[in-house]
């Protein structure tokens, strides 16, 4: 919005935020109200946070440098997050930042700059903060980067080995309209939280999930929700409050019923899958002597064996989608839930049929269930990174606290680099990173932290140079 002359405008053009498309009404140089784009059947109420945001007290008024860094120069500091900031001119900031980047590159090499810069700063493509900072750092000679996401760290590693890229898994998911018209039974591990469908990376112009589920129910469709939370599904459902973390045991029990009652679609497995025979040996306990039966799972998950047996039979008798929320893979051994969910759906043999199959992310983000784009949208080119060093995105604290230490990732033996500069644009790891006190200790280690942001987020307050 900085490029708009808001003081002289009364109506801004249509804009796109993560929560949807909208038109802003402007008064006295600030956003007075917003109106969702016409045709959005269930606009997100979070758009209501935009009024007043341009002049909010948390806005960063201009470039600033942390007092300790300005007085003492670059170096590790436990004062980050508590020190005061000094306003500087754009010319002075540019000179300070350029000099520090050149010092780090000349002394330690480009690998010493961490530019993962994870965050959701902008729904636009040209104004996408990560794209801009990555392009900038590549032009500088490269940087240590990050892979995958906090939302889908385990999925991003396992699913390409099982079914293809997880990106295609979401973009080619069964559309909500197809579910409303064809699905009989929606079996949800982790629920379908409609609150999460309010937003989408890159923005969105439609929120179809709520009305699609209403039409699904009106047609007689049933929802089974495995979750410790009743409101993980909006409206009527069969809520099964299993012990948290036992979803894979439940899936195995359902698969056991299919296998022992001849409900497996062998023809589908023979044509489209490989490895079922090996999996079935484990499922039936041939090698370890432990059949993964409903009775076995009942002692683990807290649900009755009869209930699980009945559900498996209903799944085989109806057009069924097995959906696994992203939350299930954000734990240790998180790769097991989406992998087993897909296996269960393959045993039913309904993948590819209207209203049947597997889903991963319904109720986790708005994209899952949207009609796919017919062509790829343009993106801002970033160029090539000469530095090949990377970390899994959620390992930033480990990297800063243990430089030079070896670790295992996705079949590789890697080493954490020695980072001297953390460069972040439009992101705030304090709102999604695990173990915040440990993150604070880690951020005391680099020589310099640079943050680009319009607001004084926790990350901006831990910076040395704020742009």
What are these model-derived regions, one by one?
Residues 1-263:
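N-terminal export/assembly segments and adjacent metallocofactor-ligating motifs
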Residues 108-112, 264-269, 352-359:
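Flexible, glycine/charged-enriched surface loops at secondary-structure junctions
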Residues 109, 123, 303-305, 309, ...:
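Gly/Pro-rich turn-and-neighbor structural signature
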Residues 116-124, 296-300, 325-333, 364-365, ...:
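Conserved short loop/turn motifs at secondary-structure junctions
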Residues 118, 271-275, 314, 357-369:
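A glycine-rich phosphate-binding loop feature that marks nucleotide/adenosyl-phosphate handling sites
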Residues 129-215, 219-226, 249-252, 346-462:
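Extended redox/cofactor-interaction regions of prokaryotic respiratory oxidoreductases
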Residues 217-225, 229-317:
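Long, well-ordered, tryptophan-enriched scaffold segments
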């Amino acid at each position: 919005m900085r490029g708009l002359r808001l003081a002289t405008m009364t109506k801004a053009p249509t804009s796109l935020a993560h929560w949807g498309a909208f038109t802003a009404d402007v008064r006295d140089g600030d956003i007075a109200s917003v109106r969702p784009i016409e045709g959005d059947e269930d606009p997100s109420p979070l758009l209501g946070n935009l009024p007043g945001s341009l002049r909010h007290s948390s806005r960063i008024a201009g470039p600033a440098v942390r007092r300790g860094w300005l007085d003492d120069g670059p170096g590790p500091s436990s004062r980050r997050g508590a020190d005061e900031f000094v306003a500087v001119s754009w010319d002075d900031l540019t000179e300070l930042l350029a000099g520090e980047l050149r010092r780090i590159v000349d002394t330690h090499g480009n690998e010493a700059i961490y530019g993962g810069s994870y965050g959701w700063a902008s729904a636009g493509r040209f104004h996408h903060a990560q794209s801009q900072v990555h392009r900038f750092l590549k032009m500088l000679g490269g940087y240590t980067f990050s892979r995958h996401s906090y939302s889908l760290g385990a999925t991003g590693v396992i699913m390409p080995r099982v079914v293809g890229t997880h990106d295609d898994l979401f973009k080619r998911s069964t559309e909500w309209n197809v579910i409303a018209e064809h699905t009989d039974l929606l079996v949800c591990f982790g629920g379908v939280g409609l609150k999460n469908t309010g937003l989408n990376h890159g923005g969105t112009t439609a929120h179809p999930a709520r009305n699609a589920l209403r039409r699904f129910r009106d047609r007689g469709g049933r929802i089974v929700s495995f979750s410790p939370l009743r409101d993980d599904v909006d409206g009527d459902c069969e809520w099964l409050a299993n012990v948290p973390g036992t979803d894979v045991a439940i899936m195995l029990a359902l698969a056991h019923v299919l296998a022992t009652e001849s409900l497996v679609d062998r023809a589908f497995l023979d044509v489209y899958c490989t490895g079922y025979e090996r999996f079935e040996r484990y499922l039936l306990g041939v090698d370890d002597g432990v059949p993964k039966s409903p009775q076995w799972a009942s002692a683990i998950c807290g649900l009755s064996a009869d209930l699980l047996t009945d559900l498996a039979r209903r799944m085989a008798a109806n057009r069924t989608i097995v959906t696994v929320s992203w939350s299930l893979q954000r734990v240790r051994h998180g790769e097991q839930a989406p992998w087993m969910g897909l296996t269960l759906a393959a045993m039913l043999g309904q993948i590819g049929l209207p209203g049947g199959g597997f889903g991963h992310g319904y109720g986790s983000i708005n994209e899952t269930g949207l009609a796919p784009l017919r062509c790829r949208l343009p993106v801002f080119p970033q160029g090539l990174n000469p530095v090949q060093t990377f970390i899994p995105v959620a390992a930033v604290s480990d990297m800063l606290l243990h430089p030079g230490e070896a670790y295992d990732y996705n079949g590789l033996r890697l080493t954490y680099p020695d980072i001297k500069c953390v460069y972040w644009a439009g992101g705030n790891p304090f709102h999604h990173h695990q173990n915040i006190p440990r993150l604070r200790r880690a951020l005391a280690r680099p020589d310099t932290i640079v943050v680009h942001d319009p607001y004084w987020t926790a990350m901006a307050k831990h910076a040395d140079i704020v742009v």
